[in-house]
Amino acid sequence: MKKPFYITTPIYYPSGKLHIGSAYTTIACDVLARYKRLMGHEVFYLTGLDEHGQKIQTKAKEAGITPQTYVDNMAKDVKALWQLLDISYDKFIRTTDDYHEEVVAAVFEKLLAQDDIYLGEYSGWYSVSDEEFFTESQLKEVFRDEDGQVIGGIAPSGHEVEWVSEESYFLRLSKYADRLVAFFKERPDFIQPDGRMNEMVKNFIEPGLEDLAVSRTTFTWGVPVPSDPKHVVYVWIDALLNYATALGYGQANHANFDKFWNGTVFHMVGKDILRFHSIYWPILLMMLDLPMPDRLIAHGWFVMKDGKMSKSKGNVVYPEMLVERFGLDPLRYYLMRSLPVGSDGTFTPEDYVGRINYELANDLGNLLNRTVAMINKYFDGTVPAYVDNGTAFDADLSQVIDAQLADYHKHMEAVDYPRALEAVWTIIARTNKYIDETAPWVLAKEDGDKAQLASVMAHLAASLRVVAHVIQPFMMETSAAIMAQLGLAPVSDLSTLALADFPANTKVVAKGTPIFPRLDMEAEIDYIKAQMGDSSAISQEKEWVPEEVALKSEKDVITFETFDAVEIRVAEVKEVSKVEGSEKLLRFRVDAGDGQDRQILSGIAKCYPNEQELVGKKLQIVANLKPRKMMKKYISQGMILSAEHGDQLTVLTVDSSVPNGSIIG
C-alpha cells in the first residue's frame, strides 16, 4: 500500500489581489496532488490564508470595516479564484478559524511552560508590510540624519521600516541551532533545489541564530496569549502551525494528522519565505517533538522584463484575465512549463501567446485533428487493433515513448515540471514525425499496404492516449477532450500506462473539434498588454528604431577583442573575513571552479559591515587577472565585480543554481 501524501501551499496573506505568482504556487501543488492521486496515493492538499497581523488591521481600518469582515471578503475572493483555476484542495484553512486559534494558544503556553519561550524586550527596525524585523545591516537602504544617526530605512522587499521597541516573548531558536544543522546534514535533500540549504546555513545559522520575537503588543488583531492577553501571538508561530492544525493536531479528532503527518509531507513555498520554513518551522517541530516534513521546495518568481510585478509599472498579470480570454489549460501549461527549477522565469505576452500557438495548437492540437480525421477516413472511425512492429517505424516510436515515460515520472517525482512536460512534448514531436515517416496517405492508396495503415492508425491513437494520461495533472480539460475524441473515458489512473494498452474496437468521434484554435498573435499580445495597464506598449505604436548614441563612459572605449580577453566567472563565497590592519579590505575564499579554492582581496569592507552575509553567495569575478600581493602577505587572485552608484556599492551575484566556474559573457 502506498504512503499517504500531504502537500501544502504557503497560506497567503490577504492584503491585496493575488496575481500569477500566487497562482503559480497553488497550481504547482495542484499538479503534484493530482499526479499522486493518479499514481494511487491517498492525498491531502492544503491551502488557505494567513489572516492575522498589523497590516490586516490597518487595511480594515482604512476600509472602514472590521478586520474579520475584511478577511471574510478576501477569503471569498481567493476561494473564487481557486475555483476558477480548478484547484483540487482538500481543505482551505484560515488562521481565524476557531480550532486553529485554540491550538495556537495552547502551543504557546506549552512552549512557555517548557522554557522554549521567554519574556524579554525587543528593539529593532520593523516592516509592517513584511511583518518582519530587520537589523541595520539587513536593510537595503539606510536613512541618516545630519549627524549620521540612522533614522529609518528600506527593507530588502522595498518597504519602509520603522523603529519598534516593545516588550515581547521570544522563541529560543538559538537553543536548537546545532540540532537543526545536524538535521540538515542527515537530510541533505530536505530543501530543494540544491544550494538553498547552504544559503540558509551560511546566512542565518553560522553567523549566530538569534531568538525570535513571537508576540506583539502594538496591535490586537491576532491570537491573544492566554496567560498575558495584552500580547498577541506574532505571525510565524500562528501561521506555520496551520500545517498541523489543519489535519487535527491538538484536537479531539486527529485521525488525519496521524495518517498524513506520518506519510510523505511536502511543503512548497516561494523563495522569499524559505527562511521561515527552513529554520523556524523545523525548530518549532523539534520543540513539539513532532516528525519533520520530507521535502521543502522553494521555487523562484515570475518576473517581468522590467523587474518584479508592480501596479505602478503597469506590468501586473492577474490569472483571471488570462483564463477568461484563453481558457484555463493554457495558463496552467504556461506557468508549469516556463519556470525553471530553482530560478526565476520571465513572463512576456509574446511568449504566452507563442506557446499556445506553437506548442498547444500546432504540436498537440494538429496531431489530434489529423489522427481523428484519418481514422474516420480510412477505417470509418474505428481504431484498428494494436499490433507491434506493423511498420518499420513502430519499434522506434515505442522505444521513444517508453524512455520519455520513464523521464516523465522521474521529473514529476522531483517536481521538475518543465522537464516533465519536455518529455511529453518529445513524445508529441516523435509522433508527428511518425506520420511523416509512414505517409499514411500513400499506404491508403489502392496499391498501398492496408495492414501497415492499420498499424499506423493504432499507434497514433495509442500515442495520443499516452499523452492524454500524462498531461492530465496539468491540463484536465485538454486530457478529457483528447480521450473523448478518441472514444475513451477520462483518465483515472497513471500507475500502469503502456502504448499497447489501447482498448480494441474503440470508435473515435465522427468529426473532431480543434482543442486549441490558432490565435492572432498581434491582437492577443495587445490584449494582454492592455489588460496589464501597459497600453503604451501595444504593437500599434511606432516601432523604436535604435540610433547610435554618444557613449557616456568614465573610461576609454575598448574594442570587442580587448573585452573578450577578460574571463568573468561565477564563484561561490566559502569564507570571508576582515583583513587585519585594513579598514577597507575583506579577504575571500571562493570556489571558482578551479578544483581548489582561491583567495581574493576586495576593498568593500565599509559597504558590508556584516561581511558574513556574503557567505554562500555566488559572485561574479574576473578570473584571469594577474595575481598580486597585497598588505605584504596576501596573494589576491582575481577581482570581485560590483555595481556602484554614489556612495552605494553592491556586489554582483547570480542565482544559486548556476554552477561554480560558469563563464559569464
UniProtKB/Swiss-Prot annotation:
Cellular component GO terms, alphabetical: cytoplasm
Subcellular localization, as worded in the UniProt entry: Cytoplasm
Short sequence motif named 'HIGH' region, residue ranges: 12-22
UniProt main location, coarse: cytoplasm
Listed Pfam families: Anticodon_3, tRNA-synt_1g, tRNA_bind
Residue positions of motif 'KMSKS' region: 308-312
Biological process terms in GO annotation: methionyl-tRNA aminoacylation
Keywords: Aminoacyl-tRNA synthetase, ATP-binding, Cytoplasm, Ligase, Nucleotide-binding, Protein biosynthesis, RNA-binding, tRNA-binding
EC number in record: 6.1.1.10
Binding site for ATP: K311
Superkingdom field: Bacteria
Entry keyword Transmembrane: no
Molecular-function annotations in GO: ATP binding; methionine-tRNA ligase activity; tRNA binding
Record field: catalytic activity: tRNA(Met) + L-methionine + ATP = L-methionyl-tRNA(Met) + AMP + diphosphate
Protein name (database record): Methionine--tRNA ligase
